């Protein structure tokens, strides 16, 4: 699965960061959090570059296009890759500005300065706390300069995420029912920024994939084109009662193109589930179904044509 849409279409993202008065960092993005854990991952990325605790990264969680930098959106499994690239570059720029200001405050210090969990370190020794440096940057009569960074980039790169799904099913031929006994999804999504969120992303995607394979079908009126099952009562989503124990695993291969060695994990988990179930039914019964979902009606029709009923 390709990460993002470049070079077919535009990929652009923006980030803005501010060193707050208490030494924490404010992060503002155009990228939207829609439940996939993006805000957590962006905060982790910022904390990683600045060598800070994630609790000191304050992200604006409700994006407002009147004030936030521009981002092309939450789609195509792109955010941790495309927006993540810009977050990394913006955090590096902020770090450069912080250390440059620290150098002005400590002109006698000859050792290399670095950030270390709320402190500006000179070699192995703490030189000034980030909080005190921030106060100086806001209120110094001689050198007041609020430290901010903003980056907007067109990201002209891409990489490929891979994955596979294994399913074991039990088929009741006479009733046209499929029971999923075991299912596991394995992905190479590069370096996992947040393994727990990654696992939850896979579980959600697999649940969607099982729905595509077994129950989800939009039925349209042939004359008007109107949906005939446009409610959650009639459009059959998988529920907890229908979902087996879902297992997720990863092959963590650091990707040299990703900002932190990472690549796509948004949509890939939803893709292989339905084909894996279909192939398991083929293996169990010898009948090849080439249309989803595998509803009882469709299964019984196929089994009757194959002479199994």
Across the structure, where does each feature detected by a protein language model lie?
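Accessory "access/gating" subregions that flank catalytic or transport cores
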Residues: 1-18, 237-240
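Internal nucleotide-binding/catalytic subdomain
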Residues: 20-22
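Flexible, small-/acidic-enriched active-site or ligand-binding loops
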Residues: 41
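Short, aliphatic-rich beta-strand segments
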Residues: 24-29, 180-182
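Gly/Ser-rich, acidic/histidine-flanked active-site/gating loops
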Residues: 32
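C-terminal catalytic domains of large/alpha subunits in multi-subunit enzymes
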Residues: 44-309
């Amino acid at each position: 699965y390709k990460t993002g849409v470049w070079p077919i279409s535009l990929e652009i993202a923006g980030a803005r960061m501010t060193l707050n008065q208490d030494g924490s960092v404010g992060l503002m993005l155009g990228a939207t959090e829609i439940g996939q854990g993006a805000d957590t991952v962006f905060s982790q990325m910022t904390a990683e570059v600045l060598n800070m605790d994630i609790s000191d990264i304050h992200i604006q969680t409700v994006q407002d296009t009147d004030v936030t930098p521009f981002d092309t959106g939450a789609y195509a499994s792109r955010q941790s890759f495309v927006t993540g690239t810009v977050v990394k570059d913006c955090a590096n720029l902020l770090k450069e500005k912080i250390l440059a200001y620290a150098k002005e405050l400590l002109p006698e210090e000859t050792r290399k300065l670095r950030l270390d969990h709320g402190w500006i370190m000179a070699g192995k020794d703490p030189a000034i706390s980030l909080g005190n440096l921030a106060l100086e940057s806001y209120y110094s009569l001689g050198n007041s300069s609020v430290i901010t960074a903003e980056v907007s980039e067109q990201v002209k790169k891409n990489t490929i995420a891979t994955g596979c799904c294994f399913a074991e099913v039990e088929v009741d031929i006479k009733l046209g029912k499929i029971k999923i006994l075991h299912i596991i999804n394995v992905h190479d999504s590069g370096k996992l920024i947040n393994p727990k969120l990654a696992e939850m992303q896979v579980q959600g995607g697999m649940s969607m994939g099982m729905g595509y394979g077994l129950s989800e079908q939009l039925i349209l009126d042939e004359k008007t084109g109107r949906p005939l099952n446009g409610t959650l009562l009639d459009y059959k989503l998988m529920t907890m009662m229908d979902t087996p124990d879902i297992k997720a695993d990863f092959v963590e291969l650091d990707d040299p193109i990703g900002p932190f060695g990472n690549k796509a994990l948004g949509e890939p988990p939803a893709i292989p589930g339905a084909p894996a179930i279909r192939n398991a039914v083929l293996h169990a019964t010898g009948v090849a179904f080439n249309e989803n979902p595998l509803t009882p009606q469709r299964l019984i029709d196929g089994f009757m044509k194959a002479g199994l009923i």
